[in-house]
From Swiss-Prot:
Any one GO molecular function term: monosaccharide transmembrane transporter activity
Keywords: Membrane, Sugar transport, Symport, Transmembrane, Transmembrane helix, Transport
Cross-referenced Pfam families: Sugar_tr
Protein name: Sugar transport protein 2
Membrane side Cytoplasmic: residue ranges: 1-22, 471-498
Organism for this UniProt entry: Arabidopsis thaliana
Tissue specificity as recorded in UniProt: Pollen specific (at protein level).
């Protein structure tokens, strides 16, 4: 049964573009990979602020946290503690590389299954961890799950969705990331006062992994992946099922042509880096992920409880503040889901950059003026104002760079280098997330509130990047992206031969 029907944007081939129940179900199930990712992002900051967790694994950090005269900005500065958060993303880089080959050779569906299995085993290992080695080992397996999932899920959704609805359906991945973050912050709040509560928090990661594992048995492989692997008839059958119509020849032929070009490419990475036509999507896709991480968002997502405790909030108050922030994150992502295929990508990205710049600069100014090296901020007004500003900042990210940092790289590459190109985007995400996770607390200790001004300047730079270098991609079939967008862009057309 069709949920809706509309032709794609004028100027592109008029593929029938029904949004069927089959497509919607496949996209929702696949997007649970975002729930896994979000849960992990949200859980680590709360766990690392729990006294029971610090006593079990980082007693020296616990002691430093409770010193009366400890520098406010340096309470949690510890390389091993930061490695607990960041080790996952280091593993994710390697896993994404492997996944790009697995996905091309065996398909998107089995790769998504593997992601859920890695994540499930990692969650069980963390739940039962008795020493730091087990804890880090579990994080590495979680990293493999995240690497496989983040590499494959957005591609899966982009390939299975009609062009007219691709943006909104892909935003579901980011929406479930925000739901995962919100769920994790609430779980941390509930478990923070329990003995060994950190085990329940970390073990909770098994829930989204199980949902994805079971759900992956009910999704279709993408037609593009089937046809790319020589299964033309199966690809045609799946295309009819997910489109809900018999007349799929036009779209099938377009995919078939793209796969014929793709199968001639024996070394996708060599093709990606040596062919001039691939340079525009490579630069834009990779830089979008770089900028997404250097908005400063994971400073808030990883370490929000730590930041609120740094300002003098108690453990419970800091966790409640985090729940509020993450609730705003989820609500704002819904706005993106509703407007992304109407407003377009560029408009949201530029507005988000402006909103985040203003709030980061203001937060930096407030902390510079009011948070001294020793002792909490006096009164409740300043922490409340900072909380409101963080909510405004998070909403700006959630309806722009959050979902679109994943969506745009998944829709701009030609099929022959799509896995390789998207790997570069995911790898950039993992590298930058590792850097933030591993070094932010140390940077906070050294640069203090000036760090927020740094992120504000980065937001200005990325807004200018969108203005001058990123084409609008809404409503354009992936197979036509080069012809309709890159070849006509004033700064990128020189890379295409006539």
């Amino acid at each position: 049964m069709a949920v809706g029907s509309m032709n794609v944007e004028e100027g592109t081939k008029a593929f029938p573009a029904k949004l069927t129940g089959q497509v919607f179900l496949c996209c929702v199930i696949a997007a649970v990979g975002g729930l896994m990712f979000g849960y992990d992002i949200g859980i680590s900051g709360g766990v690392t602020s729990m006294d029971t967790f610090l006593l079990d694994f980082f007693p020296h950090v616990y002691e430093k946290k409770h010193r009366v005269h400890e520098n406010n900005y340096c309470k949690f500065d510890d390389q091993l503690l930061q490695l607990f958060t960041s080790s996952l993303y280091l593993a994710g880089i390697f896993a994404s590389f492997i996944s790009s080959y697995v996905s091309r050779a065996f398909g998107r569906k089995p790769t998504i299954m593997l992601a859920s299995i890695f994540f499930l085993v990692g969650a069980i290992l963390n739940l039962s961890a008795q020493e730091l080695g087990m804890l880090i080992g579990g994080r590495i397996l979680l990293g493999f799950g995240i690497g496989f999932g983040n590499q494959t899920v957005p591609l899966f959704i982009s390939e299975i969705a009609p062009a007219r609805y691709r943006g909104g359906l892909n935003v579901m991945f980011q929406f479930l990331i925000t739901i995962g973050i919100l769920a994790a912050s609430y779980v941390n709040y509930l478990t923070s006062t329990l003995k060994n509560g950190w085990r329940y928090s970390l073990g909770g990661a098994a829930v989204p992994a199980l949902i994805l594992l079971i759900g992956s048995f009910f999704i279709h492989e993408t037609p593009a992946s089937l046809i790319e692997r020589g299964k033309d008839e199966k690809g045609k059958q799946v295309l009819r099922k997910i489109r809900g119509i018999e007349d799929i020849e036009l779209e099938f032929n377009e995919i078939k042509y793209a796969t014929e070009v793709a199968t001639k490419v024996k070394s996708p990475f060599k093709e990606l880096f040596t062919k001039s036509e691939n340079r525009p999507p490579l630069v834009c896709g990779t830089l979008l992920q770089f900028f997404q991480q250097f908005t400063g968002i994971n400073v808030v997502m990883f370490y929000a409880p730590v930041l609120f405790q740094t300002m003098g909030s108690g453990d419970n108050a800091s966790l409640i503040s985090t729940v509020v922030t993450n609730g705003v994150n989820a609500i704002a992502t819904v706005i993106s889901l509703l407007v992304v295929d109407f407003a377009g990508r560029r408009c949201l990205l530029m507005e988000g950059a402006l909103q985040m710049t203003a709030t980061q600069m203001t937060i930096g100014g407030i902390l510079l003026a009011h948070l001294k090296l020793v002792g909490p901020i006096t009164g409740h007004a300043v922490p409340l104002i900072v909380l409101i500003l963080i909510c405004v900042y998070v909403s700006g990210f959630a309806w722009s760079w959050g979902p679109l940092g994943w969506l745009v790289p998944s829709e701009i590459y030609p099929l022959e280098v799509r896995n390789a190109g998207y790997f570069c985007a995911v790898a950039m995400n993992m590298v930058c997330t590792f850097i933030i996770g591993q070094f932010f607390l140390s940077a906070l200790c050294r640069f203090r509130s000036l760090l927020f001004f740094f992120f504000g300047i980065m937001n200005i730079i990325m807004g200018l990047f969108v203005v001058f270098f990123l084409p609008e991609t809404k409503g354009v079939p992936i197979e036509e992206m080069a012809e309709k967008r890159w070849k006509t862009h004033p700064r990128w057309k020189k890379y295409f031969k006539d």
